[in-house]
């Protein structure tokens, strides 16, 4: 019986590593998984491995994709003169739910945060700057989260992009300070984009 308890403990520990999952939720999920049919557990494990192994970064915007270029960058109907810069891929999902923004994106994969050991060179800022130098982008909307790290990242990006002669705007404050774009509702996101200000 000890080996069984050890296996359960290991599963709980792994589930706790997921964002937003505490010990009680991890425990609940672990016991749920153990009670699932073997074929369902296998399908879940295969889906996780498949997503992990087949997902890579878009060569243009650094969003997650299964091909070399994501479906947004390859869409000819998108407005290529405007790029919305976000911290994480899930921010793209949140902004796309609004169905109003028709430009392109760039995913930084984080925000500048020296206290958390996250520096500009660890983000995809160099890819963004090269992209801006090689294309006819007229406006960059900075849609980083309205927290200390997001504001620092926005200021840093604005200092780099403005000398390129590109208009730099920041999403409006409809999203609460300290909040994440990912969790905002569609109307709030739409108002934040519509009310963006030049920085």
UniProtKB/Swiss-Prot annotation:
Toprim domain segment(s): 81-176
SMART domains tied to this protein: TOPRIM
GO biological process terms, semicolon-separated: DNA recombination; DNA repair
Listed InterPro entries: DNA_Rcmb_RecR, Rcmb_RecR, Rcmb_RecR_Znf, TOPRIM_dom, TOPRIM_RecR
Domain of life of the source: Bacteria
C4-type ZnF: 58-73
Pfam families from the UniProt entry: RecR_C, RecR_HhH, RecR_ZnF, Toprim_4
Keyword annotations of the record: DNA damage, DNA recombination, DNA repair, Metal-binding, Zinc, Zinc-finger
GO molecular function, one term: zinc ion binding
HAMAP family xrefs: RecR
Family (UniProt): Belongs to the RecR family.
Function: May play a role in DNA repair. It seems to be involved in an RecBC-independent recombinational process of DNA repair. It may act with RecF and RecO.
Stated name of the protein: Recombination protein RecR
Origin species: Caldicellulosiruptor saccharolyticus (strain ATCC 43494 / DSM 8903 / Tp8T 6331)
Protein encoded by which gene: recR
């Amino acid at each position: 019986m000890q080996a069984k308890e050890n296996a359960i403990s290991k599963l709980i520990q792994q589930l706790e590593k997921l964002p937003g999952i505490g010990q009680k939720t991890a425990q609940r999920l672990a016991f749920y998984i153990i009670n699932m049919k073997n074929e369902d557990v296998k399908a879940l494990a295969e889906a996780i491995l498949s997503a992990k192994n087949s997902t890579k970064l878009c060569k243009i915007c650094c969003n997650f994709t299964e091909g070399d270029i994501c479906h947004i960058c390859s869409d000819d109907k998108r407005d290529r003169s405007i790029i919305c810069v976000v911290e994480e891929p899930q921010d793209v999902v949140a902004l796309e739910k609004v169905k109003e923004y028709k430009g392109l994106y760039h995913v930084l994969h984080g925000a500048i945060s020296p206290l958390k050991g996250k520096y500009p060179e660890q983000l995809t800022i160099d890819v963004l700057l090269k992209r801006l130098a090689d294309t006819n982008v007229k406006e960059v909307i900075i849609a980083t989260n309205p927290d200390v790290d997001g504001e620092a990242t926005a200021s840093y990006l604005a200092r780099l992009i403005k000398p390129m002669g590109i208009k730099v705007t920041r999403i409006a404050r409809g999203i609460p300070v300290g909040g994440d774009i990912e969790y905002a509702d569609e109307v709030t996101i739409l108002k934040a984009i519509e009310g963006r200000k030049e920085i």
